[in-house]
Structure formats: C-alpha cells, structure tokens
C-alpha cells in the first residue's frame, strides 16, 4: 500500500473512532504521569508584559482527568489531542510530549498559504502560496487574497485554531510558522507550514473551504500519511492498531514506530520549494549544508557577506566541521573586502549550545561568555542533587557535564570554579529571588570542561582561540530572523545583542507594531523525558550503593538518611521510560507507550540576562531593531531578503525603498 492514504473513507473511519477506543484507566494514569513530569518545568508565572496567555498545566491536567471520569472523552485520540493542546498552550518549545495515537497518522493538505505585502511596508494579506508565485511574475489581475476559512475570518481561524498549538512564545513567530519556510529543506523538516500540516492533527472536517475577496471559493481536502516507520498497514480493526501503537509488547521483529523507512511518506502533491533549491550556490558550506556563506550580487552591497546557519543540531565530528566552516567563512569574507556581515538565522530552532558559543567567540574573541541559569528548587531535584553531589567528587565531577546536579561541577555565571561548597549552596532556594522557589544562579556548564578540540568553544578548555581579533565590529553585523529563532539560536542572538549587534526580522502578524527577532523558547536547558529517566535511574543506583556501603553500615544515622532519600525518590519520581526509544517491555514502568520518537521534553533551567536577574529571559520582550513584511519577491526568492535587510541595516534610509515598518527607525 502507498504510504500516502488519500481515501476519504479511511480518514472518516479514523475520525469516527473506529481506529481505537481507549481504556479509561490507562489514560487517567497518563494524565497523572504527565503531571509528575510537569513538576520539572522551570518557569513560574509570567509578568503582565508577556504577550502570550499563561496556562496552569497542573490545573489543566486535573480538568482532563475529570473529563475522563465523567465520560466526556471517548477515544485515545481525543485524549491525546487534549493533552497535546494543553502542553502547547505553555508556548514553550522545550515542553513537548509525544503521544501514541498522534504518531499513527499525520494529516496535511496541499494548499499552503502565505502572508504577502505588496511593497514590504503596507500591511500584508493572505494568499494561496501558488498565487504569491504568480504575483511575483507580475500577473496580479486574477489574484485575490484569502478572507475566510470555514466561515471564519481567515486570520482569526489561523491564529485561534492552529497557531496557538505551535509552541513559540511570541505570537508573530507562531504566525510565521503557519506558512512555508524556505530554510526547512536544509534540515529535512516539513516545508509547507503549520496551516498545511495542522501539526499532524485531524483538522476537524474532511473539507476546508477557503473564500477569497472576489467571492470565489476553494475546497481543500486533508489527507493522511502513514509513516513507513509504523510498518505495513495491515490492521483490520481499531483494537489491533491501538495495541500495536499504544501498548507495550510486540511479537514482531520491529516495534511499532521503529520499522526502517522515512518518518513520513511523500505527499501526493508538490510542496513549496525549500532548502538548496531555492537559494543561490554558496561560496562556502559545510557537508551538512547547515552553514553557508554568500556574497550579495547587488553592486551597492559588495561589501556585505551573508552567513546562513539553519540549525545547531549537531555533535561530535559535525561540531568540529561546523567550527572549521565558520572560521573559514569569516576569514574568507574578511580577506575579500567584506566589511559587513548579515547572520541569517531564519528558521533556526536551536540544538547543541556548544557550537552556538563557539560561533559567538569567533565573532567576538575578546569577549568572555556569560551564562546565567536557575532550576526550580523541588523536592525531587533536591534528592537527585544530594545523590549526585555525594557520589561525584573532584576529578569525577568533571566527567559529568549532564546532569548539572553535582555541586562540585557547577560554576558561576562568569565561569568561576569552586563557588559552591555543597549541594545546599547550589540548590538554595535563593532568598533574593522573589516569588518562586529557585536555585542560586550558575552557568550552563563549565566551558573549560566542555570545550575540546573535538567539540570546541574557541579559546576555552583545550580548544585554541580560532580567530584572535574581531573581523567585524558590532555596528557592522546584523542578525536576520523570521522570529522562529529558538533555544541555542536565542542564546546566540542574546549574546550578540549584548555586544550591540542589531536585528532585523521579517513577516509576523498583519499589524504595524514591533516584532521580536527571537520568538522561540529562551530557556536555559532542555531535558528530554528519557534524560530525566536516566538521571532518576542513576540516582537510584547511587543511593542504593551508598545505602549498602561500608561507611553506611558503620554509621546507622547515615544509613537511615540515605534510606530516607531513596524512599523519597521512589515516591516522587515518575515511572521510567525506556532509555533507548522503542525498547522492549522490560524497560517500561508505564501501561501506555508514548514518546515513540524520543521528542518529549521539559525546560529544566531558566536563562537570565544581566539587566534582569529575577525574571526568566523567556518572559522578557525584546523588539527587533527593524521589521519588514514579506514581498512576493521575498517569498519566491528568499535570498532577496538579504538585500532588503542589508539596505535597511547598513545603508540607512537614503538607499531607497528598503525601509523598516514605520513604527521604528534604524
């Protein structure tokens, strides 16, 4: 059978719940487990200036449990979607959960939309993406903007039905994520946008009706993909499919979700062009295509280089190649008369923070890196910290960069060592932190311990200083984003902004108002649920070892204290997940399978900036220096955004029509 299921009957059967009816007890238990994992989330209450609505996750989980008890929820799919939407309302890209029924089918359609301004300054309107392509060719007479979707005003439908589930903390970033991403092809992610994919969720009806301003209508029919990793589609009833996807245990060679093949089947329609096919050939690039250096063709912009970085998801040898490519690119730009640099981080969702720190140090080799983080001081973390801090001492502590729960391993935000004499000194809670119970401030990790020649941070540890003097001054560097910059990308932009580097961002909601360059998560560290399970497992082993040690046997008071910690750990900890995705039954302590692809996570640590050391950076609004709306040319030829950004940021107003939206001046 084709991986792409277009039969409407299949979709309707799925929607009607024939695919699976779920055991209420299991899903109620799932909500209980989610609440235990939720206690690891670091952020507290947001200040009034925070743009996104806040959500009480524990209260939301309680309401879901009540719906299970009173029979309001009738299927596993309904339950999983409710839980997914609740988690999404936190608008925290580090807070995610992979739920079994949502991994079975992925719904999408082939009519992406885009938001286009005629000149980059007038308010944009919604168009079918293919119409934007026609607009760029100059044939505008027959083109009409989209005004309604399923009887609702189009922008309202998109923002209230879809954008709210996308996990970005900024509403403009969520809006941009609805539409095609030209950089998605570099990282192998879906390129048509969340309106076309609906985050894989059933959109609520088998037909979506688009109405245009000229009165014409277009019917869009969602289809379902069957991931090849789910194996053959040979299930004859919903119960069998439910058991394969959601219950531990299988007699087949491969576990559901682990069959060889692509994560998603190829759709039956053409996706918007993305990645290398839509950008010019770079002067320099790495083997993964994540780092690319360009020169601008415009005669007036020959002194501008563009360094495009689409992801920081890498490690090991890829990190070393990344570092070498950045150095080669900056050296080439400087030696070829480039005095200005555009750093394009559009669509960059983050990844490994070490390459991000390395990038900053190559741009500003004379500036030390400051990082400030805190975790929530909870009972469970206290137990883990006591277990790790008692076990790892001296040289041993240097070997455990993660978890950051050994006091001996922690350094100050300015990288001072030996500042925490005990676990209590690190755990706190900090008496100067108002409101929430938070740890004392400390760095992401020790750069001296983390930086190696294999995975370098320039000038730290065993990694030499790759570039010894600045090649570009702050006023000659500008960061370009689409607001979706997240995690490590956010950390890099924050470090650059602290040096005076300016930012320019494209798109966003159709309103003449500021927009943030960093609209994604600005947390200090993401922990996957498997990481949490691994740390809990290790802590149990350490405490059991301490409990039976010779020292404990000789000291009944110490043995009693360790036994108390071990009991508390067992009481507070969530059930373990398999430490390797899709492991066999004996690794499960939970009745339902979830996190099939290992993507579930929480934000373990908050990040802070020197100007405000008590409000998590996630909640601080930072408008870009310049905002532009996308023109048809910017949509079809995304490299044209670099010309617009360079003229606005480096050339001043006198260079012509390339201006920022008029709420702000450069």
Swiss-Prot record:
It is an enzyme of class 3 (hydrolase). The keyword RNA-binding does not apply. GO terms for molecular function: serine-type peptidase activity. It holds the Pfam family PDZ_CPAF_rel. It comes from the Eukaryota. Pathway: Mycotoxin biosynthesis. Residues 303-504 are annotated as: Peptidase S41 domain. Its EC number is 3.4.-.-. Glycans are attached at residues 70, 214, 234, 555, 612. This is Peptidase S41 family protein phomP1'. It comes from Diaporthe leptostromiformis. The gene is phomP1'.
């Amino acid at each position: 059978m084709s991986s792409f299921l277009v039969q409407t009957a299949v979709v309707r059967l799925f929607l009607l719940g024939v695919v699976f009816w779920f055991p209420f007890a299991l899903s109620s238990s799932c909500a209980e487990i989610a609440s235990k994992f939720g206690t690891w989330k670091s952020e507290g209450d947001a200040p009034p200036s925070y743009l996104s609505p806040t959500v009480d996750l524990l209260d939301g989980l309680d309401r879901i449990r009540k719906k299970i008890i009173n029979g309001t929820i009738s299927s596993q799919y309904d339950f999983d979607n409710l839980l997914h939407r609740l988690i999404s309302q936190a608008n925290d890209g580090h807070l995610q959960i992979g739920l079994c029924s949502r991994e079975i089918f992925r719904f999408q359609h082939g009519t992406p939309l885009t938001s286009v301004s005629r000149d980059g300054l007038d308010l944009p309107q919604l168009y079918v993406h293919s119409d934007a392509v026609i607009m760029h060719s100059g044939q505008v007479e027959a083109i009409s903007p989209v005004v309604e979707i399923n009887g609702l005003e189009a922008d309202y439908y998109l923002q209230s039905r879809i954008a709210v589930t996308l996990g970005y903390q900024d509403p403009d970033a969520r809006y941009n994520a609805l539409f095609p991403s030209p950089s998605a092809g570099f990282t192998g992610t879906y390129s048509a946008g969340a309106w076309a994919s609906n985050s894989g969720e059933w959109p609520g009806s088998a037909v979506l009706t688009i109405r245009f301003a000229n009165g014409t209508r277009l019917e869009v029919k969602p289809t379902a993909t069957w991931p090849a990793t789910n194996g053959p589609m040979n299930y004859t009833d919903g119960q069998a499919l439910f058991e394969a996807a959601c219950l531990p245990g299988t007699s087949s060679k491969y576990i559901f979700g682990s069959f060889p093949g692509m994560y998603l089947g190829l759709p039956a329609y053409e996706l918007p062009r993305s990645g290398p096919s839509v950008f010019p050939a770079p002067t320099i690039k790495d083997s993964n295509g994540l780092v690319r250096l360009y020169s601008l063709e415009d005669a007036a912009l020959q002194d501008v280089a563009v360094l495009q970085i689409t992801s920081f998801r890498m490690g090991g040898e890829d990190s070393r190649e990344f570092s070498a490519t950045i150095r080669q690119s900056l050296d080439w730009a400087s030696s070829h008369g480039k005095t200005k640099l555009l750093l394009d981080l559009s669509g960059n969702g983050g990844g490994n923070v070490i390459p991000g720190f390395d990038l900053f140090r190559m741009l500003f080799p004379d500036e030390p890196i400051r990082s400030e983080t805190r975790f929530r001081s909870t009972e469970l973390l206290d137990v883990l910290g006591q277990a790790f801090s008692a076990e790892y001492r001296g040289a041993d502590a240097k070997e455990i960069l993660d978890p950051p729960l050994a006091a001996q391993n922690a350094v100050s935000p300015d990288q001072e060592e030996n500042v925490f004499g005990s676990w209590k000194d690190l755990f706190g809670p900090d008496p100067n932190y108002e409101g929430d119970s938070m740890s004392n401030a400390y760095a992401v990790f020790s750069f001296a311990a983390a930086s190696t020649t294999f995975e370098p941070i320039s000038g730290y540890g065993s990694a030499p200083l790759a570039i010894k003097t600045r090649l570009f001054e702050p006023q000659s560097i500008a960061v370009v984003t689409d607001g979706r910059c997240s995690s490590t990308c956010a950390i890099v932009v924050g470090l650059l902004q602290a040096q005076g580097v300016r930012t320019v961002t494209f798109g966003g909601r159709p309103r003449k108002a500021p927009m943030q360059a960093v609209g994604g998560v600005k947390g200090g560290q993401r922990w996957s649920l498997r990481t949490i399970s691994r740390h809990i497992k290790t802590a149990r082993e350490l405490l059991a070892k301490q409990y039976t040690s010779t020292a404990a046997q000789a000291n009944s008071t110490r043995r009693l204290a360790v036994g108390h910690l071990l009991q508390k750990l067992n009481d507070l900890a969530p059930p373990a997940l398999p430490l390797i995705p899709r492991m066999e039954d004996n690794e499960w302590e939970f009745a339902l399978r979830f996190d099939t692809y290992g993507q579930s996570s929480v934000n373990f640590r908050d990040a802070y900036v020197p100007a405000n050391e008590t409000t998590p950076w996630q909640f601080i609004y930072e408008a870009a220096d310049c905002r532009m709306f996308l023109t048809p040319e910017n949509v079809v030829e995304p490299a044209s955004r670099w010309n617009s950004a360079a003229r606005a940021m480096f050339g001043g107003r006198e260079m012509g029509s390339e201006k920022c939206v008029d709420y702000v001046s450069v």
